[in-house]
Amino acid sequence: MDTLEEVTWANGSTALPPPLAPNISVPHRCLLLLYEDIGTSRVRYWDLLLLIPNVLFLIFLLWKLPSARAKIRITSSPIFITFYILVFVVALVGIARAVVSMTVSTSNAATVADKILWEITRFFLLAIELSVIILGLAFGHLESKSSIKRVLAITTVLSLAYSVTQGTLEILYPDAHLSAEDFNIYGHGGRQFWLVSSCFFFLVYSLVVILPKTPLKERISLPSRRSFYVYAGILALLNLLQGLGSVLLCFDIIEGLCCVDATTFLYFSFFAPLIYVAFLRGFFGSEPKILFSYKCQVDETEEPDVHLPQPYAVARREGLEAAGAAGASAASYSSTQFDSAGGVAYLDDIASMPCHTGSINSTDSERWKAINA
């Protein structure tokens, strides 16, 4: 009680300006979790909690690396290579941030370095978030290297702008509610920024979840895989809980810190595994699947001018075994690039064009005519 009276006296004094938000005299248990050390060591419980899941996931990635490399080498899919590398990078950055936080002291320079590592980790996580949404809704049917580069360029710029803004607010205007002892804890840009960003991402992911139930599904091609919408629903719920915790903190209710602690732990520890389970597990399994599959709309025409090459089984029934064997490799449409004898060719995904048209390589045009005759 004496300590509380001293704080009240200090805030009411005309000699010292009052802080923007009063610090907590007796730290809440959810605040203690963020900075309390394990015994006499300099290792914090919070850093250890974030380190263990990232280390376990990195071990899993290394264990699956030989089979994953073999599968990627066979398919040569740029989108899977991109996601696999980004998931690896997120795990490594998360481990590096936790290790550095365990080794630095509580000086101001060390605190700034720790916050910069937090922002770097957030930058990579947000880049993957935006990449999944953009590839899924806008460019899912385009899986060439050029489209991947364009998407990554867009997400890099957006993620960098977000991280720089958040980092500037965090370093120059630290949240007084997250100051403990003689240093400031990483506060994600403050309560207000946390609230605004959480509400924004909640609305985005909620819109993605309800898109298949809206009239827009008749106008645009939407992913048909259920895992895509489960992924969006999980992130929408996570941002909703984070926003509620931020609202409580804005009203000086310290219990809101427990809510944001839980969402922060789940996001920085299990977001990369969520990406792997939702989008990469099927690809690296026994039967690879397309990352974003689309339902094809059949358009009826009276006199089609161009015919798709017939399946291999039909060609065999017509007695053209030699031509059918050569045409099977050319007729297997994929949304990824593949190697041919004359070089590298790219085929558009079936969802990106009407189902009654197709592109036939000039070298095989006569062969398709023989099959379709």
From Swiss-Prot:
Principal localisation: membrane
Residues spanning the membrane: 48-68, 76-96, 123-143, 151-171, 192-212, 234-254, 265-285
Annotated localization: Membrane
Pfam families given in the database record: Tmemb_40
Protein keywords: Glycoprotein, Membrane, Transmembrane, Transmembrane helix
Name the UniProt record assigns to this protein: Transmembrane protein adipocyte-associated 1
Gene Ontology MF annotations: G protein-coupled receptor activity
Gene (UniProt): TPRA1
Organ and tissue specificity: Ubiquitous, with higher levels in heart, placenta and kidney.
Classification of source organism: Eukaryota, Metazoa, Chordata, Craniata, Vertebrata
Glycosylation sites (chain numbering): N11, N23, N361
Organism of derivation: Homo sapiens (Human)
InterPro entries to which the protein is assigned, alphabetical: TPRA1/CAND2/CAND8
Record membrane topology: Multi-pass membrane protein
Family membership noted in the UniProt record: Belongs to the UPF0359 family.
One of the GO BP terms on file: lipid metabolic process
GO cellular component: membrane; plasma membrane
